[in-house]
């Protein structure tokens, strides 16, 4: 991988120029604040740096580097920010490489073109490579030798251009009337002119545009007119050729000098003769030639599809061939060939640099993902709210269940062994079987008395048996709001065998023990106090008489009505409550 500078107008790359003259520094990807400063300084649109992105040292001031020894590499300070982005233009104006030599060589080439009218001089100039190489004066000055050769070729090119213009003035009707022979002749002339112009360009390019490298690539291959060095560096560094071709017209590739020379020697001309710079004309079978108005491009033309036609060469060309020449007009076919030749190398570089081909597509994907994440987060919030509501409801139900458990007394049947069946009811208490079970007051009971304020209460009644000829009962009252325990009462209900006479024996938490007797008629029991005993410190006024009435109504609910008489008040209704059966 060749390390290149990511600045827009900078052509510096690794291996170019003297060693250690230019150093390359990575973008601070881990420091977001400093990375934003670098991106603002670089000013590149739709571009994101990666670990393969570098900036050369020419974009930093001298105080941006730490002081080190001369043989050590440059080291940026932790706060260094690039601020210089016009060094390329200043360097050229200072006279380092290009323009002064172009002016000098341009003057020399202009002098040689003035002598191109003499055919003898033209031949001498065309043969200057062999003569100059044989002369002893050329050995101490190899650079002058290199410059003399392009000048001679420039003179030959000027002579052939004059001849081509004279041939171009002939009327088009004469060309159309000529036949296949005249067409082949014109094609051979066009190919010869093309070869001559190519040879002239080989000589004129280094003289007019700078020195030629040993590999045959001139400096203008990296700084094409109208596009700038940034396009070539961009195609190598971060831009994909395919996405760039969609934004702007792709550049027509320009082959280096050595590649042109090899192709011109290898490919035959239209008429079978193709003059080269060092070889004579060679015979080859005629083939179809392009029209005279088509531009000269360095890309290979597609051969005619036939049985003996060789396969099309789609090998990826060097990226330097994708640079457009100054006076070339690319046809649609040549553009496709440029895409085929340059896309391979650019795709390889894109895969190495791990860049995406479309930043807009990635942004749209990120937006879609954000919308989906927000939607899922909203659904998750609603689910959490529902779960919290259900949790609160479950908590309330558990609290109510715990309250009911605290209110209820343990059943007497729970004292029996777990594997034992419930006891069989005695036939003596069968007339009172409709009273068995656990009952809860619904609605709450009401209490009144002349000496008391009206009140309401909750009550649980539990009536059961253990196989004996009697019933066990307990009545537990609670405050309806605070569930505070209030009146409590428990005892036994006995029946006289073979009669309907019932005795009710109870003990209350108020310090009273009473015996009530009465009769049962169907599903109704009426009893009245027979004797009442109380503790010595019982609260006054003392209770002197109590009556009760139990009844099972048509809805299957149990009703109880209690009346009471004290030392100060006559017999008056005191309590009334309706029970609903909970368990049998």
From Swiss-Prot:
User: What pathway does the UniProt record associate with this protein?
Assistant: Nitrogen metabolism
Q: Which GO terms describe its molecular function?
A: DNA binding; nitric oxide binding; peroxynitrite isomerase activity; zinc ion binding
- Which EC class heads this enzyme's classification? isomerase
Query: One GO biological process from the UniProt record?
Result: nitrate metabolic process
Kindly state the positions of the motif HCFC1-binding motif (HBM) in this protein: 236-239
InterPro entries (alphabetical): Calycin, Nitrobindin, THAP4-like_heme-bd, THAP_Znf, THAP_Znf_sf
* Catalyzed reaction equations: peroxynitrite = nitrate
Which key words are in the record?
Cytoplasm, DNA-binding, Heme, Iron, Isomerase, Metal-binding, Nucleus, Phosphoprotein, Zinc, Zinc-finger
**Cellular component aspect of the GO annotation:** cytoplasm; nucleus
Residue numbers binding heme b:
451, 574
Q: According to the UniProt entry, which residue ranges have a biased composition of type Basic and acidic residues?
A: 158-178, 248-267
| Gene3D superfamilies tied to this protein | 2.40.128.20, THAP domain
- Provide the protein's localization: Cytoplasm; Nucleus
Q: Where is the composition biased (Low complexity)?
A: 122-138, 190-208
Return the annotated region ranges for Disordered.
84-330
**What are the Phosphoserine sites (modified residues) in this protein?**
240
Region described as Nitrobindin: spans on this chain = 422-584
Cofactor binding notes: Binds 1 heme b group per subunit, that coordinates a highly solvent-exposed Fe(III) atom.
Q: Which cofactor does it need?
A: heme b
The superkingdom of the source organism is Eukaryota
Family the entry assigns: In the C-terminal section; belongs to the nitrobindin family.
**Record remark: domains:** The C-terminal nitrobindin region coordinates a heme and bears the isomerase activity. The N-terminal zinc finger domain likely binds DNA and may be involved in transcriptional regulation.
What PANTHER family does the annotation carry?
Answer: PEROXYNITRITE ISOMERASE THAP4 (PTHR15854:SF4), THAP4 PROTEIN (PTHR15854)
What does the protein in this record do? Answer: Heme-binding protein able to scavenge peroxynitrite and to protect free L-tyrosine against peroxynitrite-mediated nitration, by acting as a peroxynitrite isomerase that converts peroxynitrite to nitrate. Therefore, this protein likely plays a role in peroxynitrite sensing and in the detoxification of reactive nitrogen and oxygen species (RNS and ROS, respectively). Is able to bind nitric oxide (NO) in vitro, but may act as a sensor of peroxynitrite levels in vivo, possibly modulating the transcriptional activity residing in the N-terminal region.
The record's note on quaternary structure and interaction partners says: Homodimer.
Q: Mind telling me what this protein is named?
A: Peroxynitrite isomerase THAP4
Q: Which organism is it from?
A: Bos taurus (Bovine)
């Amino acid at each position: 991988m060749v390390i290149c500078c990511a600045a827009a107008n900078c052509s510096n790359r690794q291996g170019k120029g003297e060693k250690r003259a230019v150093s390359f520094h990575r973008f601070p990807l881990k420091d977001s604040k400093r990375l934003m400063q670098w991106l603002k300084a670089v000013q590149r649109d739709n571009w994101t740096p990666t670990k393969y992105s570098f900036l050369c040292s020419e974009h930093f001031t001298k105080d941006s580097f730490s002081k080190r020894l001369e043989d050590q590499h440059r080291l940026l300070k932790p706060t260094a920010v690039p601020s210089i982005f016009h060094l390329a233009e200043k360097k050229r104006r200072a006279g380092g490489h290009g323009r002064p030599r172009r002016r000098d060589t341009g003057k020399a080439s202009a002098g040689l073109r003035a002598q191109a009218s003499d055919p003898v001089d033209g031949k001498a100039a065309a043969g200057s490579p062999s003569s100059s190489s044989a002369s002893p004066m050329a050995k101490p000055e190899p650079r002058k030798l290199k410059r003399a050769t392009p000048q001679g070729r420039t003179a030959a090119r000027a002579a052939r251009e004059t001849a081509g213009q004279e041939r171009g003035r002939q009327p088009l009707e004469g060309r159309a009337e000529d036949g296949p022979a005249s067409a082949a002749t014109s094609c051979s002339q066009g190919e010869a002119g093309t070869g001559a112009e190519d040879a002239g360009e080989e000589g004129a390019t280094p003289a007019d545009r700078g020195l030629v490298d040993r590999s045959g690539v001139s400096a203008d291959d990296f700084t094409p007119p109208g596009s700038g060095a940034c396009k070539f560096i961009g195609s190598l560094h971060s831009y994909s050729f395919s996405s760039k071709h969609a934004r702007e017209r792709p550049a027509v590739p320009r082959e280096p000098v050595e590649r042109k020379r090899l192709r011109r020697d290898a490919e035959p001309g239209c008429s079978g003769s193709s003059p080269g710079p060092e070889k004579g004309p060679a015979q080859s079978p005629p083939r179809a030639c392009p029209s005279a108005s088509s531009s000269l491009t360095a890309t290979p033309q597609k051969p005619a599809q036939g049985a003996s036609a060789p396969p099309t060469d789609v090998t990826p060309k060097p990226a330097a061939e994708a640079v457009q020449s100054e006076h070339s007009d690319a046809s649609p076919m040549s553009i496709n060939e440029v895409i085929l030749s340059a896309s391979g190398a650019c795709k390889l570089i894109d895969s190495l640099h791990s860049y995406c081909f479309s930043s807009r597509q990635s942004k749209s994907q990120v937006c879609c993902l954000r919308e989906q994440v927000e939607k899922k987060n909203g659904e998750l919030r609603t689910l959490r709210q529902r779960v919290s509501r259900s949790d609160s409801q479950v908590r309330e139900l558990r609290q109510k269940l715990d309250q009911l458990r605290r209110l209820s007394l343990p059943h007497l049947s729970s004292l029996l062994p777990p594997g034992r069946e419930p006891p069989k009811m005695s036939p003596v208490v069968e007339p009172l079987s409709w009273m068995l079970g656990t009952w809860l007051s619904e609605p709450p009971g009401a209490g009144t008395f002349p000496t008391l304020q009206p009140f309401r209460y909750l009550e649980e009644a539990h009536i059961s048996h253990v196989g004996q000829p009697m019933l066990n009962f307990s009545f537990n009252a609670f405050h309806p709001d605070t569930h505070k325990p209030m009146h409590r009462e428990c005892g036994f209900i006995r029946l006289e065998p073979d009669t309907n006479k019932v005795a009710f024996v109870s003990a209350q938490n108020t310090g009273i023990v009473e015996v009530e007797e009465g009769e049962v008629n169907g599903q109704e029991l009426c009893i009245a106090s027979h004797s009442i005993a109380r503790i010595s410190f019982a609260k006054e006024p003392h209770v002197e008489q109590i009556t009760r009435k139990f009844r099972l109504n048509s809805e299957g609910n149990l009703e109880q009505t209690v009346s009471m008489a004290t030392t100060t008040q006559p017999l008056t209704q005191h309590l009334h409550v309706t029970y609903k059966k909970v368990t049998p």
